[in-house]
């Protein structure tokens, strides 16, 4: 399970309420959060990055702007690293790509906590059906749901690292021949 990480500010600052900020904690965004922020800041990468940093750290825009550049750069790098990592890169110990453990468990639509899922390769019929969807996002959600059994809302609750792990494996399923999946001896 993921433990929120922190950056100790070299140059402490103050919160919007005037309280000292000496440490900034950051945690993974969910796929749904990232998707929403991406839609809100479509044409401005700087605003998107700041919004992601704010969502990950809980810092307001004003608090982010009060950081000195070296502290901001450290936080930015850590948040970007977390956003781009796969769960297997962050989970300690062995990682089963056929039944991945979630870096951050989610609550299913039925209210149960999900800590892992079983991933099954799509059939040819499923990939044909995927191709009938109107755009890339709909195809991605369809194939992700078909191979995991997660609903769209459950997929949106996945941490970005869990989502990245899933997408990496789905790309393997869609592009690699069967020999790629044989157990290594």
Go through each PLM region and give its residues.
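Mixed-charge, glycine-accented linear interaction segment located at domain edges/termini
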Residues: 136-154
């Amino acid at each position: 399970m993921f433990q929120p990480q922190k950056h100790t500010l070299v140059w402490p600052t103050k919160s919007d309420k005037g309280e000292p900020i000496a440490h900034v904690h950051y945690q993974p965004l969910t796929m749904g959060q990232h998707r929403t922020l991406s839609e809100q800041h479509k044409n401005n990468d700087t605003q998107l990055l700041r919004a992601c940093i704010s969502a990950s750290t809980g810092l307001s825009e004003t608090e982010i702007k009060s950081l000195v550049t070296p502290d901001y750069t450290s936080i930015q790098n850590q948040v970007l690293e977390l956003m781009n990592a796969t769960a297997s890169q962050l989970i300690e110990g062995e990682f089963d790509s056929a039944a991945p453990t979630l870096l951050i468990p989610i609550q299913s639509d039925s209210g149960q906590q999900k800590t892992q899922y079983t991933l099954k390769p799509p059939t040819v019929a499923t990939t044909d059906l995927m191709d009938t969807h109107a755009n890339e996002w709909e195809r991605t959600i369809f194939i992700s749901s078909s191979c995991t059994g997660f609903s769209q809302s459950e997929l949106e609750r996945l941490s970005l690292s869990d989502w990245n792990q899933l997408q990496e494996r789905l790309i393997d399923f869609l592009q690699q021949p069967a020999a790629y999946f044989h157990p290594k001896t």
